[in-house]
Every structure is written in C-alpha cells, then in structure tokens.
Amino acid sequence: MNWRLLMTILIANLLCARGSAHGASSAPDPSAATGSQSSEAAITARLPTNTGGFATATGSDDSAVTVASLADLLAAFNARQHHILVKGEIYGGPRLTTVTFATTDWNNTTIEGASGGSAVLKNIQLKFDGEMLPAGKNIQNVVIRNITFHGVIRDLQALPAQVYGTSSNAGINYEGVSLRRVTNAWVDHCAFYDTSDDLMSVTLSSDRVTVSYSRFYFTSEWLTMHPDPMWNWAGKNQDLANERLAMLVGANRQDSYAYGGNRLHVTLHHNQFGPNLKGRPLLRGWIHAYDNYFDNGATPTGLTAAGSDETQYNALQIGSGGVVYSENNYFFRTNQSIQVGLDSPGDVYAFHENANRYDQTTGRSARGEVFSLAPVGYAYRAGTASSILKAVQTFGPR
C-alpha cells in the first residue's frame, strides 16, 4: 500500500469537502413560545463561526426559551422551539428519556445551559437523528453547549436485563448526545459521565463536527457498582460496570471516512478523556485531535463486582477507514495510548501525529508519521502539550 499516495488522496478529498456548500437551512418554526422567554443569561446571543475545528455552526437566532423541568423540556420540543436554555437539573425519570430530533425542521438549533455551570440533563439523551431523511440530506447547524449529561446508576441497575435488538434496550442505546446524519454541529463546554452506551457518538455520515472544552469520564461509583448487571450488547454479554466507553465516531467500516463517502470530519480539541475509562474514543472518521488531555490518573487495576478487568485497554483507537491527526495531546498514565483496531485485516487507515506528550504511559502504542501536507483548512491555535494541564480547569460547563 502506497501510504503517501493514500494520504494525498485523503487530504485532497478533505479540502474539496471543506469547499462545498454548507447546505440550505430552514427557517425556525413560528409556533407559540413554550415556557417563558428567557431572562436567564445565555452564554452568547450568537456564537462565532470559528469553532477551532471543522464546524462553523452558529445554531439558532431565536430568543431562548427557559426550561427547568422535564415537562418544560418536552413542551419546548413539541412546540419546535429552536433555542432552548436549560436551567438547573432536569431528571428524565428512572426509565430514561430520549429526545429525538429527526427532521430538517430542526436545522439551526441551539440547546445550552444557563450561565453558572449548573445545567444538568440526568437520564436524558439528546438525539439528533436524520437516519430516515432522503439520501443526501442531513440535519444542519446544531449547537449543544454548557450542559452536564449523566445517568443515575441505581436507575440503570434497576432496568430489566437489557438485550440489544429487543424492546428492553433503552440502556444499551443510552448516551448523552448522539449525532446521526448531522452536518455542521458544535458540542462545547459540556460534561458527560456515567451513561451506559458510549458517552457520545457521531455516526451515519455526519460531517463537520467540533467537540471542544468538554469532559468525558466515569465515576468511581460506576466502577464499583454492586449489583453489577449483565447486559447483552449486540450478542455479547458484558457487565455494566465494564462498559466505560468515551466516544464513537463512525459506527462501522461502511460508516467511515475512507469507505463511507469521505464524511465524518470531526475536530476534538481541549477535551478531557478520563478518568476511569475502559477505552476510546474509537475513530473511523477524518479526525483532528489537538490539545486534549487523556487522563488515566486513577489507574484502576482491580475487578468489577461481576469479575471483569477494570484496566484501561486503550485511550484512543483508530478504526477501519479512519484518518487521525493527533497534535499536542497529553497522555497521562494511559495504557496502550493509541491503538489500531481494524474491522478487517488490510483495511486502510492513516495515523499522523505531532508533539504529543506521553507521561508514565504503559503498554504498546502506535506511532504516527508527520504530515507532509497541511492537514486542515480552518484557523486554530494549538498550544504545547504541557500547557494542557493548566488549561484543563477551563474545560466543562461554566
């Protein structure tokens, strides 16, 4: 395989993709306001177009509608409110609540927490899902920011045995945010922990996504939960405490950059991954990851209540069809810091890196080549890997 030729083709495709039109966007729904027009401070009236990544999302121009309960949130959703401001903690109930945005009516949407960092969606998933749209159409221009997403362990333990593909699978599909067939999305200053699938995912030919200044981790209570229920994930039984996965970009080989139509351009910058992660992000897209902190400082080494190994199996995984450029990231005590895991032997992938720092890491780690061409076409400023330890305190909701 001529990897230099492959990379030239991949980067050329990237630049062509960036030069394409952003796509049409629909006007916000004029339905009557639900709840109250917000007197709470939104983070910004309108966000800048430079996200430090592939996204140029600005979200909604509408006035924000404040929601402070599950009833408020669902009423705002049913009224097609495009700018929702979350105030305080909202609980989705013991059986979990998924709010699904499934049509292009949801183009130009902002969901954000009020300033102060106290906005929480507990047992609630925000799912932007354009899977049923006509071919070539995605939901466009979505901003999610300044919110903490997390599950309630006792509620997940109390669910009936979860089996993939059955009616008892709400827990298996539970994430904080799921982006499916979404183009131009920005997830910023959020926190994700203790959800029973990946904490977040970007799949099904989504494109031009930036995830920034966010935290992804599991608590020690998750790691040591008892009872530790056994669930069936896609034909494989595994205990819940052992399902500690950060993020998925690209659902499978067919939903990857190289094999899925040169989509899934995703930037990850200024995020903290860990502690207590089993593994991932698993990356099958065209990924630029810079100034992230991969934190395995807790270094779990024991067994879960069901007898599974608590040890981290990787920190960042490159999957089939993925192109990953890792720049100025800090890996702290991570095990198998960067791992190549292909769906089939011989699948193409590419890994390039620059100025990463590996501090007290263990196990084998892939090593990347240096780019010979400019990897991205957007403006960004990468710091030094050592500066991330100071910057990490600015990550998460504010």
What are these regions (language model features)?
Residues L74-Q81, Y91-E112, A119-R145, G151-V182:
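Extracellular beta-strand-rich solenoid/capping regions of secreted or surface-exposed proteins
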Residues L282-R398:
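Extracellular beta-rich repeat passengers
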Residues L96-T100, N123-A135, Q157-S178, D194-T203, ...:
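Extracellular beta-strand/beta-solenoid scaffold signature
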Residues L70, K87-E89, A114, I124, ...:
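Active-site-proximal beta-strand/loop segments in catalytic clefts of secreted hydrolases
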Residues M1-M7:
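Bacterial N-terminal signal peptides that target proteins for export
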Residues M7-T8, N13-L85, Y91-T97, R357-R398:
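Extracellular "leader-to-stem" segments immediately downstream of a signal peptide or signal-anchor
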Residues N107-N108, E112-G113, K137-I153, R181-D194, ...:
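Right-handed parallel beta-helix
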